Amino acid sequence: MNILFIFSRHSENPNDSTLTKDLSDEFFKQGNNVTVVTLLEKKYKRETELKKENGYEVLRVKTGNYFNIGNKFEKGMTILTMASDLKKEIIKYLGDRKFDLIITHTPFVSTEKLINPLKEYFKCPAYLILWDIFPQNAKDIGIINNGLLFSFFKYREKKMLSAYDRILCMSEGNINYLKENYSYLDKNKIKLLRNWAIIKPNTEINKQEIRNKYGFSEDEFIAIFGGNMGKPQKLENILFLAERSLENKKIKFLFIGNGSEKERLEKLVKENNLSNITFINQVPREDYEKITASCDVGLVSLDERFTVPNFPSKTTDYFKLSLPILASLDRCAAEDYGNFLQNKVRGGLFAEAGDIEGLYNQFMKLYNDESLRKTLGNNGRKYYEEYLGVDKAYETIMNEIGRWKWVFLQVKLY
């Protein structure tokens, strides 16, 4: 099959592993003709280019700047012009190709202003991987307070979702939320596609050497949060947990990554003398996994104000590395993700976000019981191996393509 992927990012390093890159690599590995379209921000001072990377063609389209910039006006202008930039260059460079399917993801590159013209031009269906439910998630945590602005984005959301032939959700909670709150959607279009990863064997690491490199001793108990430090995570709740744990000198907290809230969090740590917290900037993937594997607990955090189900993607990394998870979750996520984590996989524990004493009690269960940590970590690893391989994601999508073709054929016949 000829597959057109449209991704907001696509690493040029063939050894990098990300959700989107792993998926396109798998489609290519399975014998499909793969083309990836992705952004090439103007800050890199390069023009639009089409070249082979890792065996298949990648079209990098010059756009405005979006990632890791503080200028909201510039970011907004990039979003407004992105669809037309991408559409123009896709037609210019790929217009003579035949595609059987378009696959993209939220946010930003999924707008119907891009997808509808491409569907019509290439005469093929489009599948959406739904990673966030915007604008409701932004309203929940106070990013959008204006009623008119919220209504505008809800209108845009309806136009976007209606453009797709399949909407692929990360969890049963996402599926149920869409079915209950989006009456205009055909329920048969909404399907489950769990996050995925390349299945790799457990690798032995020198735990003491890695810990020493980053200033930790072998006998310390390290809880790690890796990933985006933004408003949705509300990492103040983890700071409160760290403050509650200050008396125990063996307990340490490690934050790895970047994000819009990182600077503010570092300031809070300094102001409150939270000497048990360490921040590390984003590191290469291989180093991140080694650091994470040398820790004792993986942390997940979500703002308690959320009313939409979220499924933290870092879960797959923790499962992969046999790391037990402690999650601070809003009520909506507790019913979906929390139940999945604690009762289905049995790969971790959770408490409701904002209940610091409840979170601390769950944390101390893990601290005091090495056997429990090992059991939870092994359960997560087992689930990862059985259900979260990128090959499973590939099979899910291919099965949906088969069903879509069958329905399309029936419509033509009758």
Specify the residue positions occupied by each region the protein language model found.
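A short helix/loop element that forms part of the nucleotide-sugar donor recognition site in Leloir-type
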Residues: 48-51, 202-216
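Helix-loop-beta element that forms the nucleotide-linked donor phosphate-binding surface
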Residues: 162, 168-169, 174-197
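A short, well-ordered alpha-helix in the C-terminal region of glycosyltransferases
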Residues: 358, 365, 372-386
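N-terminal subdomain of nucleotide-sugar transferases
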Residues: 1-57, 245, 409-414
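Nucleotide-activated donor-binding/catalytic signature segment of Leloir-type glycosyltransferases, i.e.
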Residues: 248-250, 254-257, 262-289
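Membrane-proximal helix-turn-helix segments that form the acceptor-binding/catalytic region
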Residues: 117-121, 148-169
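Conserved donor-binding/catalytic core segment of Leloir-type glycosyltransferases
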Residues: 217-233, 238-242, 254
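Nucleotide-sugar-dependent
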Residues: 14, 233, 284-293, 298-319, ...
